[in-house]
A protein has these predicted regions:
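Terminal amphipathic helices with adjacent charged low-complexity linkers/tails
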Residues: 184, 245, 250-252, 262, ...
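Short Cys/His-rich micro-motifs in 6-15 aa windows
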Residues: 814-819
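Short, Gly/Pro- and small/polar-rich lid/capping loops
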Residues: 437-439, 615-664
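Function-dense linear segments that define catalytic or interfacial modules
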Residues: 21-33, 41-120, 128-131, 142-145, ...
Length: 819
């Protein structure tokens, strides 16, 4: 904990946990049978049992920041809300919440489709895509001590502009500040599966719509699948499942109509509701982990879940106190009420909704490690059955705790057992524990909804476990940490396509090391990649990592667990780079059929990730390669006359935090020339994100001067030509590119070309970062296995580096460096 002057007030996690425990105990003192600070601290200590999420962890008992304890909010205006005034109001509310440390979600289905008549100077509506960009830009502007805001934008598949929404992020650099998800109803899914037409309309829920449009459901579904395969977005939200299972929607007429989700998708919310998150560390309930005597302690787990639910209810009270402080600060601000009135009214609405429902978000982390510690393999039916038992126990214990609190503290304001009587989740609880249901009818429940499963990425770093219900990413992996732009001392290893900087480091998964110790392996020894692979094969993590788990079984597991989670589950299905779109389609359809409320696909390499696998080639493929006769490598012959057309790869890179593009012309698959320049709508070249290949066409004008054009095909097969590459780019960069193209043309080996580029002594900082981008663009063409002569491994100091898939790999110690 620190203040705005940089003064530090805590020196250890113990200090932080005592701060939290003392505040929880203070709230407990208001109610019967209070927990002591020591009881709470013992569950928090060493992140062993219960772990509050980032906002509660940072904000509880922190008087140095005027901020909310809520992790997530959803906003949205009632009634007709697609006027410019309403759109601007949502934009302002989004920013006001983000500056208080909250992630925000909102739905765009209320915005009129493109071309609709409007009563202003434009005469027709622009549709929802321009407003996606506005909300995205607002998110990126909000500085949260070096972090960006988090935003979820959603739209109903029924909206006539939903196809434009689905395509909005396919152009590189567009809507970079938001996650996007499509709300898909059962009718659309069935029509897509059966290849039948589907009717879109606006307003989407109107009995007398102003706009109707019949489309091919399968064609639009195929686009969703393709875009998810290409760029990991959009995510899909199975909206009928969400509404059907939602307990808060039993009170829809009282303001609890679910309209969107938080940025990660695990909490569907109504407008102006919010949620605080906490997770229970499942690994800590495995007794004798990684041994034949291992078992899960259900009794201890149920006892701790009950306390966790109680703590979460206390945090609702703490949040209401924080909201009062925020509102007092707004009152005291020197601006006029005209300026600050909107923010004050926003927090009034949030306070009202929070006190009405007292929503909580008790979740879990370390599911993957729990399964491994019990000697099971993630993705098997046996492991899924165990997980369902654990989550059923969690749901019953949390709801029993909420019912007990209703008896002691009072039920949430609008509780009505009759409204909930037909809810599928409540009926499952009734069947599993009839006495719990009877008590709930008699006394009510303290919280309108209780459970979720969040990604818990940063939380899992504290617990040193797998995150959420995910399997281990890799037992050994490279991790990226986003760098605070205000921190001048940090080392930057990677800059993504939108200019955010990251530090990279190699990580051994802690629980994998625990397994190694339990099975007699030396954890101090430096292993080669081959040795690590051999060790992993003997462990319960084998064939149970993010990239090689049974993906279909993982989706079915999510659906089975979802039956015992009243909110939703945030899960990403990680896929290798070489999977096809048919698999993505199959996984999405299975997610719908299995009862998942949402699903997100990430194909390795489809966008910049936080963790990067250092994967080996498939063994069968390697064995086939080894069977081939060894042919001496022969340099391609020099071609004196350039063909009129050359195949071309498009490679994007960062130059001093600007988005640049390289066009690499290929002759027989070998780089022949390179053109580089700014990718910009005004001064450079604007290309859709999906364009990765094309042609460079050389034309000679009447004056005898050569001109180079770039041609590509769009998704529908139509060709687009960008004329005059040389005229589009800065002359200084153009001249350096001509120099590099000259040595490529005369077949200097690529690794030597890269050394030449690296040795250029250039004074301008921009040109120096440009040459690094050129090096990266060319490295992918180095033949795998080429030795990096004269270079030493930074880890072991040996001259044993070889190029592999554009990266430098050490044959001696297995260390790797990309970029």
């Amino acid at each position: 904990m620190k203040d705005s002057f940089g003064n530090i007030y805590e020196k250890s996690p113990e200090d932080m946990h005592w701060r939290i425990a003392n505040e929880i105990a203070r709230i407990e003192g208001k109610y019967p049978n209070p927990l002591s600070a020591k009881e709470v601290y013992e569950l928090l200590d060493h992140f062993r049992y219960i772990v509050p999420a980032g906002s509660p962890m940072t904000g509880i008992g922190n008087s140095h920041q005027v901020a909310s304890l809520s992790n997530c909010f959803v906003v949205g205006l009632d009634g007709d809300a697609d006027s410019y005034g309403a759109i601007m109001r949502i934009d302002e509310e989004q920013v006001q919440l983000m500056k208080r440390r909250g992630g925000v979600g909102h739905d765009l289905s209320h915005i009129r489709p493109k071309g609709s008549p409007v009563n202003n100077s434009a005469l027709t509506s622009t549709g929802l895509v321009p407003f996606m960009e506005r909300y995205s830009n607002s998110t990126r502007e909000v500085a949260q001590d070096g972090r960006r805001g988090a935003l979820m934008l959603s739209v109903s598949i029924k909206h006539p502009d939903s196809e434009a929404f689905i395509d909005a992020k396919m152009t590189e650099g567009k809507v970079t500040g938001a996650n996007v998800s499509v709300k898909i109803d059962d009718d659309f899914m069935q029509a897509a599966v059966d290849d039948k037409p589907y009717v879109q309309q606006f307003p989407i829920n109107s009995d007398n719509p102003e706009v109707e449009k019949e489309i091919s459901a399968k064609a639009l579904w195929d686009k969703i699948v393709h875009n998810a395969w290409q760029s990991a977005e959009p995510g899909v939200l199975f909206w009928d499942t969400i509404l059907r299972e939602s307990i808060p929607d039993c009170y829809a007429d009282l303001g609890f109509t679910t309209v969107s989700t938080n940025p990660c998708g695990e909490i569907p919310l109504c407008p102006y509701d919010s949620c605080r998150l906490l997770c229970v560390n499942l690994f800590s309930y495995v007794v004798n982990p990684f041994t034949k005597e291992a078992y899960f302690d259900f009794d201890k787990f149920a006892k701790h879940v009950a306390i966790a639910q109680r703590v979460m209810d206390d945090i609702v009270d703490l949040e209401l106190e924080k909201i009062d402080l925020i509102m007092e600060k707004i009152k005291d601000d020197p601006q006029s009420s005209e300026v600050k009135g909107a923010e004050y009214h926003l927090w009034e609405k949030i306070k009202r909704k929070s006190s009405m429902g007292r929503r909580t978000g008790v979740g879990i982390t370390a599911e993957g490690d729990m399964i491994a510690a019990l000697g099971l393999r993630y993705g098997t039916q046996e492991a899924t059955d165990l997980s369902v038992s654990v989550h059923k126990c969690l749901a019953i214990a949390a709801y029993r705790s909420s019912v007990l609190m209703a008896k002691e503290r009072g039920a949430f304001e609008v509780f009505d057992a009759k409204r909930e009587a037909a809810n599928p989740f409540i009926l499952r609880l009734k069947e599993a524990d009839p006495s719990l249901y009877d008590d709930m009818v008699a006394y009510g429940r303290r919280n309108i909804a209780c459970l979720t499963i969040a990604p818990t990425g940063t939380t899992s770093l504290m617990t040193q476990t797998t995150s959420g219900i995910e399997p281990v990413f890799m037992p050994v992996y490279k991790r990226r940490r986003k760098v605070n732009p205000n921190d001048t001392d940090v080392h930057v290893d990677f800059v993504d396509e939108v200019g955010d900087s990251f530090e990279e480091y190699i990580v051994y998964h802690k629980k994998f090391m625990d397994w190694m110790k339990a099975n007699g392996f030396d954890t101090e020894k430096r292993y080669t990649q081959e040795e690590i692979d051999a060790i992993v094969e003997q462990s319960p993590y084998y064939k149970a990592t993010a990239n090689d788990v049974d993906w279909l079984m993982k989706v079915k597991m999510q659906g089975a667990i979802q039956k015992w989670v009243d909110h939703s589950i945030s899960v990403t299905v990680n896929l290798p780079n070489d999977v096809d779109e048919a698999l993505v389609n199959r996984l999405y359809v299975e997610a719908w059929r299995s009862g998942c409320k949402g699903c997100t696909i990430y194909r390795d390499g489809s966008r910049s990730g936080v963790m990067i696998s250092v994967s080996k080639k498939d063994k069968k493929k390697e064995e086939k390669e080894e069977e081939q006769p060894v042919v001496p490598c022969k340099q391609p012959e020099v071609t004196e006359v350039r063909p009129k057309e050359l195949a071309c790869d498009v490679v994007r890179f960062q130059n001093n935090k600007e988005k640049w593009v390289a066009f690499v012309g290929l002759l027989n698959g070998y780089p022949y020339e390179i053109f580089t320049g700014l990718q910009d709508d005004d001064e450079g070249i604007a290309l859709p994100k999906s364009v990765t290949k094309g042609k460079i066409i050389k034309n000679v004008g009447p004056d005898g001067r050569s001109r180079y054009d770039f041609q590509f095909e769009n998704k529908r097969g139509y060709k687009t030509t960008v004329e005059g590459l040389s005229e589009k780019f800065n002359p200084e960069y153009w001249n350096y590119a001509k120099l590099i193209s000259g040595v490529l043309r005369y077949r200097m080996p690529i690794d030597h070309v890269i050394k030449l580029v690296g040795s250029l002594q250039l004074k301008s900082e921009s040109i120096n970062t440009w040459k690094i981008g050129v090096e990266r663009a060319l490295k992918k063409y180095i033949t795998d296995g080429t030795e990096a002569t004269g270079m030493k491994c930074p880890s072991c100091g040996q001259e044993s580096l070889v190029y592999q898939e554009g990266c430098l790999i050490c044959k001696n110690c297995g260390a790797s460096r990309c970029g």
